[in-house]
From Swiss-Prot:
Organism: Escherichia coli (strain K12)
Name of the protein: Homoserine/homoserine lactone efflux protein
Spans through the membrane: 5-25, 45-65, 68-88, 117-137, 148-168, 182-202
PANTHER family in UniProt: ARGININE EXPORTER PROTEIN ARGO (PTHR30086), HOMOSERINE_HOMOSERINE LACTONE EFFLUX PROTEIN (PTHR30086:SF14)
Cellular component terms per the entry's GO annotation: plasma membrane
Gene designation: rhtB
Gene Ontology molecular functions: homoserine transmembrane transporter activity; threonine efflux transmembrane transporter activity
Physiological role: Conducts the efflux of homoserine and homoserine lactone.
Amino acid sequence: MTLEWWFAYLLTSIILSLSPGSGAINTMTTSLNHGYRGAVASIAGLQTGLAIHIVLVGVGLGTLFSRSVIAFEVLKWAGAAYLIWLGIQQWRAAGAIDLKSLASTQSRRHLFQRAVFVNLTNPKSIVFLAALFPQFIMPQQPQLMQYIVLGVTTIVVDIIVMIGYATLAQRIALWIKGPKQMKALNKIFGSLFMLVGALLASARHA
């Protein structure tokens, strides 16, 4: 892979990571409700799910999955249902802003696992990666190293972007003056979770 091809993929990866989706919403809500440490656990979970998708694409299962309507539909509805459930939980969340008490109700391990599931149950992610990676793979060069470079680039970029979303959420938290504002913010993010879930449910297999 040439440096020019890598820069082209880097730009593509940045644009894709910046696009608001379930991962960004999950990171911001976790940062708001559980603080920066909770957000770090969530980001680690998102990258674990993304890494699993990348490995599946690298061994060829991504292409097989993208051609299976049944597998796509099963994962799609599981992901949509999970996001809508998260949205309902977020909508009903209390307006508390005491991060110490919140940390005791949901451990960082739970936040990590939740984030892994958010990414794993997004079939559009693995289908998109299966279509995107081959566009930047040079067949005359060793493919394994190229897949590793693309995968590491994807994860590093997404980590940086998600840290940005978590930081943005912390900035928003500075403007929250009481439980009523926090409750309203939880309803907004809960609605966004449900919206993304509905959009995922409406996705069609290519």
